[in-house]
Regions:
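Exposed, low-structure sequence patches enriched in small/polar residues
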Residues: 1-304
Length: 304
């Protein structure tokens, strides 16, 4: 904390370069955020770093007889230090993406990265000699398509190394993220997401997590709609493989929200809603309601 006689003052800058042509897209960025720089009127999640990025894309185009319309081969290099020139992270990635029929798009990416873990002595800011450096190799696949005119589906798969920051060690991640959006009618839209994530280290799992997010919207008319949101998470943390932290073996959450919205005019919307949350851990045998809320608000979009 600062005393009344102390002040913070530092500098920040960012340079961007981009070039686009029919077959090439090039980009470069240099950013510097001083250790004592603060952006009180803007979002600044971290300071004390300098970062360089270089990216290049080579584009290819299909002809009338091809099943694909466009393909891209990409490469990106990134490096980040603190302002004392101590390495925080650097990575090199390459990817291949292709656009095909049914509004489909697929991307395969390989990433090699070096990153530092937690500081061994948290009372000092030094990175060199005070952290462990880890090497990550990851494979990422993303695919999306519209099997029907009213349906969108996507899947993302992440496999490979990932730092277990809670325990300052290298682990192995398996993560699958799926999404289906169905416009069931002119009024009804159903949007379902599910994420499965598992981290392993030292031959055993660290955690297994499942997250389901369901959103249902019903447009009553041009002025009003109903929206229901249900979010359920189930996290199983291995109490025998988290040596640096105390964890709960069972963590389950269920939250729900129902909102009615009515547009009074193009600038004003009235909301009426209900929300609740439920929780379970090692000390509970079932989901217990934590809180419930009834609320109303009026939103006005002011235009000068």
């Amino acid at each position: 904390y600062l005393t009344s006689s102390e002040t913070l003052s530092d500098q920040a800058y960012k340079f961007d370069f981009s070039h686009q042509s029919e077959y090439w897209e090039l980009a470069a960025e240099q950013q510097y955020i001083g250790k004592d720089f603060r952006a009180d009127l803007g979002y600044m999640p971290k300071a004390d770093f300098t970062q360089s990025d270089i990216a290049a894309d080579r584009l290819f185009y299909g002809d009338d007889s091809s099943f694909w319309s466009q393909a891209t081969i990409s490469g990106q290099w990134q490096i980040q230090h603190n302002t004392n020139n101590e390495l925080i992270a650097r990575s090199l990635s390459s990817s291949f993406s292709i656009d095909g029929p049914l509004l489909s798009a697929f991307t395969l990416q390989l990433t090699h990265a070096e990153k530092v873990g937690l500081r061994h002595n948290k009372t000092i800011d030094a990175i060199d000699g005070n952290t462990t450096r880890f090497t990550e190799n990851q494979l990422n696949f993303f695919g999306e398509f519209d099997p029907l005119i009213s349906t969108y589906a996507s899947i993302e798969v992440i496999l490979g190394d990932e730092i277990d920051y809670q325990n300052d060690r290298l682990g192995n991640i398996t993560e699958i993220i799926g999404n289906i959006t169905w416009n069931a009618s002119k009024h009804l839209e159903i949007d379902l997401y599910h994420t499965f994530s598992q981290l392993e280290a030292d031959g055993r799992y660290v955690y297994k997590a499942n997250l389901t997010d369901l959103r249902v919207s019903y447009q009553l008319n041009v002025n009003s709609y109903l929206k229901l949101t249900l979010v359920y998470s189930d996290v199983d943390e291995n109490v025998n493989n988290n040596p640096m932290v105390d964890v709960s073996n069972i963590e389950k959450y269920l939250s729900s929200q129902l909102i009615y919205a009515y547009k009074l005019n193009p600038q004003t919307v009235f909301f009426l809603g209900y929300s609740d949350s439920n929780y379970r851990d090692d000390f509970l045998t079932q989901l217990e309601k934590e809180q419930k809320t009834f609320f109303t608000k009026i939103s006005y979009a002011w235009m000068p």
